[in-house]
Amino acid sequence: MIISTSRFGQVELKQEDVLTFTEGLLGFADLRKFVLLDDPNDEIFAWLQSCEAPAIAFPVLEPELFAPQYKATLTKGDMEALKLTAQDKARYFSIVTIPDDPTLMTANLKAPVVVNIEARTARQCVLQDNNLAIREPIFTKLQQRVVQNPAVAIKNQSTGIDVATKLHVVRDAEL
C-alpha cells in the first residue's frame, strides 16, 4: 500500500506495518492508523506517521535513550486495550516537541505511545507516575549521550524487532 505524507511524500508500506490505535492519540481521536517510520537519514528520531492524514507526523524516541532509568507501569485497562499479557511485549516511544530553537526540545515521558509488538496495536497511555514530565528537556541529554558513546547510534533501531518500518519513498517512476 502507498500512503501520502507531507514530510516524505509517497511512502510504500505493507499492511502489517500499520499500527492500529485502540483510541486516537491525545488531541487526534479520529486518527487510528499509524506507521512508525525509520528514516535512515535521521540519526535521532523515528516518525509516527498517520496513514489517514498526510500532514500528521510526530518525531518519537525511545525514552531509554535519554532517560536510562525510565520505567513505565501500565494500568490493567491499558494492558487490556493493547491486548498485552506482559509488559515486556511492549515498546515505548515518547513524542518529541521540537521548537524553532532545537536546544529547547522536549519529550513527553508522562504519556508515551505504547506498542504491542505482536498484535500491532498501540495506545498513548497516560501513566500514573506523577514524577514523569510532560515536557522533559532532552537536548543536553542527547548531546551527552553522543559525547559519551560517539560510536553508538542514538536511535535504537527498532526495525530489528519489527516495530519500525524502514522508510521507502516512492519515486514518480515507481508510481
From Swiss-Prot:
What HAMAP family does the record tag this protein with?
Answer: FliW
Q: What does the record note on quaternary structure?
A: Interacts with translational regulator CsrA and flagellin(s).
What's a single GO BP term from this record? regulation of translation
Keyword Cytoplasm attached: yes
Gene3D superfamilies per UniProt: BH3618-like (2.30.290.10)
Task: Show the stretches that span the lipid bilayer.
Answer: none
Places the protein is found:
Cytoplasm
What protein name does the entry list?
Flagellar assembly factor FliW
Give the keywords, sorted.
Bacterial flagellum biogenesis, Chaperone, Cytoplasm, Translation regulation
Chief localisation class: cytoplasm
User: Which family, according to the similarity comment?
Assistant: Belongs to the FliW family.
Naming one, the record's GO cellular component terms include: cytoplasm
Q: What does this protein do?
A: Acts as an anti-CsrA protein, binds CsrA and prevents it from repressing translation of its target genes, one of which is flagellin. Binds to flagellin and participates in the assembly of the flagellum.
Q: What is the lineage of its organism?
A: Bacteria, Pseudomonadati, Bdellovibrionota, Bdellovibrionia, Bdellovibrionales
Under Pfam families, the record lists: FliW (PF02623)
